[in-house]
């Protein structure tokens, strides 16, 4: 099945991760996604939200005290090498937190590298649809309901070749001997593939299994998010009027509609001529 998402390339230029928090979510259970600069970090959060659980995106150096409030943590992909001089700064104390943790792609390498495993460079990398083979025996809760052989989406130049002490290898591919692993006594997991993209057909099931493992309450809905965002805007405006410039495009119109006076909002439209939007005047 072809994905409608762009092909992932963890060697693409990195971007500076930013913290993101949905408004009006105080008291809600949430899963933290640490963004190592991969283009799918926010997609991971979106997939979790679609499962009914709030997900928040944080930078890799987010305060441990803040992450302790989460019910689980996912480490995203990223374009760098965990052993390189330009490796994304990361607080390894996160790996000791008492909650389920899942590393995906670069995040998988982070778990392996910081806990004593081995990550090395592949001569040709591993990209695109790849056949994943689960090892015989118990492969743990995240692969529950997943066939012993399945297709996954790989996109990496480095790979994990040796799991850290205390981890069991759960799956392999022709190029990656440690395509998935889990700790024997703690709910810590790593997967070299991208469970969050459409080209991993069983990815949704794997993420759902992880969310279930966290025990997070399913309180997130789009309606609740929208109302929370609007309430946050109202608090920030605090009774003042707001002038919003509209180009007539989808983004500005959608942003304006719920804030319009007819919707009891504070915004007043300021149309922008098309030639100004296109930089012609």
Please state what every model-predicted region is.
Residues 93-104:
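Short alpha-beta junction capping motif
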Residues 103, 107, 112, 248:
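Gly/Ala-rich beta-loop-alpha elbow adjacent to hydrolase catalytic centers
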Residues 2-75, 79-84, 95-97, 113-281:
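RNA-binding accessory domains that recognize and position tRNA/RNA substrates
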């Amino acid at each position: 099945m072809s994905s409608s998402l762009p092909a992932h390339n963890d060697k693409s230029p990195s971007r500076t991760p930013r913290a993101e928090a949905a408004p009006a979510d105080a008291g809600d259970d949430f899963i933290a996604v640490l963004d190592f600069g991969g283009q799918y970090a926010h997609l991971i959060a979106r997939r979790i939200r679609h499962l009914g659980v709030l997900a928040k995106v944080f930078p890799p150096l987010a305060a441990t005290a803040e992450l302790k409030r989460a019910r689980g943590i996912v480490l995203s992909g990223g374009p760098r090498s965990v052993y390189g001089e330009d490796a994304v700064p990361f607080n390894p104390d996160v790996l000791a937190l008492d909650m389920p943790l899942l590393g995906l792609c670069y995040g998988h390498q982070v778990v392996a590298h910081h806990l004593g495993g081995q990550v090395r460079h592949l001569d040709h990398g591993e990209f695109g649809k790849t056949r994943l083979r689960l090892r015989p025996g118990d492969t743990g809760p995240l692969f529950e309901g997943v066939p012993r052989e399945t297709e996954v989406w790989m996109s990496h130049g480095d790979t994990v070749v040796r799991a850290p002490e205390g981890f069991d290898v759960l799956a392999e591919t022709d190029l990656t001997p440690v395509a998935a692993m889990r700790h024997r006594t703690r709910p810590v997991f790593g997967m070299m593939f991208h469970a969050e993209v459409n080209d991993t057909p069983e990815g949704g099931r794997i993420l759902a299994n992880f969310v279930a493992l966290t025990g997070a309450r399913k309180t997130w809905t789009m309606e609740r998010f929208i109302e929370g965002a609007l309430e946050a805007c109202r608090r920030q405006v605090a009774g003042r009027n707001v002038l919003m410039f509209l180009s007539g495009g989808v983004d500005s119109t959608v942003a304006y509609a719920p804030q319009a006076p007819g919707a009891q909002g504070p915004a007043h439209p300021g149309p922008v001529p098309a030639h100004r939007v296109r930089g012609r005047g």
